[in-house]
């Protein structure tokens, strides 16, 4: 019986527990923060009929709204974000100036439901905005993108404006950049072009709470068509001059020169090497030939004429084999002297 009663009471206990937890869960769901949510890109994206109400996730206890307004001498626009945020409640306002482009940022965070609709997101007059017709044009021309989408602000598509000086400032430079606003985990970005004071700024920027305005400047008629990937320097800086690369002879010319050099010097080297070897090899034989040549030369001088040269050219050569041998002139003279001596002896004996 006790076991049966325990089995019957167990489902009742689980049901009772769920009934007790249900109000707590309902209270927790009811306590989720509700915030307005919208995005404005120089349009009416945050107008009352376009705003939505969202429930924030766990751990989110503030609603956020942020607005950034940008103004040049030719116009102004604003970007804004509303939604569930993070951080501490409060309000932050800041004004910025980038070479004559003015910006005003407001950030507001609150902890009540749908409390993030207090800021004025409409356009506001910022100095130096004024009546353009009241100023005289200074001759500079620039492309102007104030609140245009990126599709309408490409290259030479945006309108061209004439720059003028305002509030004691000289606007003769052209600007090309971007404005970026980040709030409630949403980032909004739009292009910015127009007349500015600086004529040679390079990727300059100003920042505020979740806000950035940055870009580059240039000088010249409509020079701000695209400065994102270009670098401009002040006219006071000397220009950079690129030197031409050094010229080198073609590979075929070097090959011909080297081959001609080798063919020219090779015989000289070979001749120089052979000469000492020949002299050393024939040194002993040439000594004997020189002595024999001196003797023959003396005989030739005594005999005289071309005969001496002829005998010297044939000296040191062995007689050819076969045939009659022709005696030299020196042998003929000796034979004549010997015959003369015999005849004289015979004549002398006969006389005695």
From Swiss-Prot:
Comp. bias regions, Low complexity = 250-285
User: Does Manganese appear among the keywords?
Assistant: no
Query: According to the UniProt entry, where is the signal peptide?
Result: 1-32
Q: Which GO terms describe its cellular component?
A: membrane; plasma membrane; side of membrane
Q: Which Gene Ontology BP annotations are present?
A: cell-matrix adhesion; negative regulation of smooth muscle cell apoptotic process
Localisation: Cell membrane
Using the UniProt record, give the first listed, main subcellular location: membrane
Tissue expression, as annotated, is: Found predominantly on the basal layers of squamous epithelium. Expressed in the gravid uterus and on epithelial of the upper gastrointestinal tract. It has been found in tumor lines which metastasize via the lymphatic system.
Under the subunit heading, UniProt states: Interacts with AGR2 and AGR3. Binds laminin-1 and laminin-5. Interacts with LGALS3.
> What is the name listed in the Swiss-Prot or TrEMBL entry for this protein?
Ly6/PLAUR domain-containing protein 3
The protein's gene is named Lypd3
């Amino acid at each position: 019986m006790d076991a049966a009663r325990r089995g019957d009471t167990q489902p009742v206990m689980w049901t009772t527990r769920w009934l007790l937890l249900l109000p707590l869960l309902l209270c927790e769901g009811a306590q989720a923060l509700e915030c307005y949510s919208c995005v404005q890109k120089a349009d009416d994206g945050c107008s009352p009929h376009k705003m939505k109400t969202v429930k924030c996730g766990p751990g989110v206890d503030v609603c956020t709204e942020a607005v950034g307004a940008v103004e040049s001498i030719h116009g102004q626009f604003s970007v804004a974000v509303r939604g569930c945020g993070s951080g501490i409640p409060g309000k932050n306002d800041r004004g910025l100036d980038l070479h004559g482009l003015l910006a005003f940022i407001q950030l507001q965070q609150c902890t009540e439901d749908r409390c993030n609709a207090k800021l004025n997101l409409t356009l506001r007059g910022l100095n130096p905005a004024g009546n353009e017709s009241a100023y005289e044009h200074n001759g500079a021309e620039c492309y102007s993108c104030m609140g245009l989408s990126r599709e309408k602000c490409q290259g030479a598509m945006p309108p061209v404006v004439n720059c003028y000086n305002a509030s004691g400032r000289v606007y003769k430079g052209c600007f090309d950049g971007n404005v970026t606003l980040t709030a409630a985990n949403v980032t909004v970005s739009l292009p910015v072009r127009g007349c500015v004071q600086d004529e040679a700024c390079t990727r300059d920027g100003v920042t505020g709470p979740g806000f950035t305005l940055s870009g580059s400047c240039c000088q010249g008629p409509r020079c701000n068509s695209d400065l994102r990937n270009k670098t401009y320097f002040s006219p006071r800086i000397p220009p950079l001059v690129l030197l031409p690369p050094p010229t080198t002879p073609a590979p075929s010319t070097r090959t011909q020169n080297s081959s001609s050099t080798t063919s020219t010097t090779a015989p000289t080297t070979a001749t120089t090497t052979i000469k000492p070897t020949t002299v050393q090899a024939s040194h002993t034989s040439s000594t004997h030939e020189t002595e024999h040549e001196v003797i023959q030369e003396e005989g030739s001088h005594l005999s005289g004429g071309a005969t001496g040269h002829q005998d010297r050219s044939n000296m040191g050569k062995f007689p050819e084999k076969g045939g009659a041998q022709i005696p030299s002139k020196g042998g003929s003279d000796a034979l004549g002297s010997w015959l003369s001596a015999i005849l004289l002896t015979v004549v002398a004996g006969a006389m005695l």
